[in-house]
Amino acid sequence: MSCLSRLNASAAPWEPPVARAMAVEQYCPPPQSLLPPPPLPPVAVPTTCGCAACLQGCFVPVGVQAAFPHAAAGCAPPPPVMPVMIVYRVVQPPPPAAHATRCQITEIEDGGGVETAKAVDGDEPQPFIRTVRSTRRRKAAAIRLPKAFRAALLPPPPPPCALGFTATTTSLMIRNIPNKFLKARLMAILDQHCADENGKCHRRGGGGGRSVVKSEYDFFYVPIDFKTGFNKGYAFVNMTTATAARRLRAFLQDHRWDAAMSGKVCDVVPAAIQGLDAFVAHFSASCFPCRTKEFLPVWFEPPRDGEQQTKAHVVGRLVVRPR
């Protein structure tokens, strides 16, 4: 049978239905448009939440897993994440320690009295009150100089008035005398001093009728070592006035005995016994075991001034020991 249509000679030939079903369908894309392409359908993928359903191999669509990964599998959602809380605690300062009772301090007032200060519980310490011991320790720690330099930094010695000299001091102790000097030689030095000072006073006075204080002495004693026959390095003299005593001290103080070939430096200080009567009463009951009266104390009448003749009176008892 002919496959050509008798109705229309120009029409396409007719094909049986089986051949049409076996024809390959080709996809023709739609024309280009301005809208974005539609999304792809969800794909089933395994979840990785770690629950029991997930471990058995259940699958959750991708769209559902992105929002609620445990909803499709029937798992309980995890607990919500708790927010981080920062707690600040205010720490109170420790209470102040209880004030302890301080020790008792005794201070010496300027007038000689003693003032005692007792500490009371709760009173505040005074930072400006310092003891004498702590002040000395700080000064000693601050000064780290050699001994020679520390001696040079010491304050100067007090004036003569602070060493015991008063307006009534007449008796003197002459120290650091050469041991070979005997009484006669020392008396010659005193006589020469008195004569020179009296001559100066008369020249200054000029005969104007003013009273002149003379330099003269009425007691003298040089202790002697009876075994060696030398003096013990000191002597006692009593001047008739305090003015004469100050003149003698100014003459002999710090005197060097270079003429006697001695390195001693003379020192003059007030004697423990003051006055002629006190010297005579002190040495009258003394015994001197020697063979000559030249070693005994003497007092003079009238006082010696380096010019006029005087009479010497021996004080004490001479005791002669048998050989």
Curated annotation (Swiss-Prot):
It comes from the Eukaryota. It holds the Pfam family RRM_2. It comes from Oryza sativa subsp. japonica. GO terms for cellular component: ribonucleoprotein complex. GO terms for molecular function: RNA binding. This is Protein MEI2-like 6.
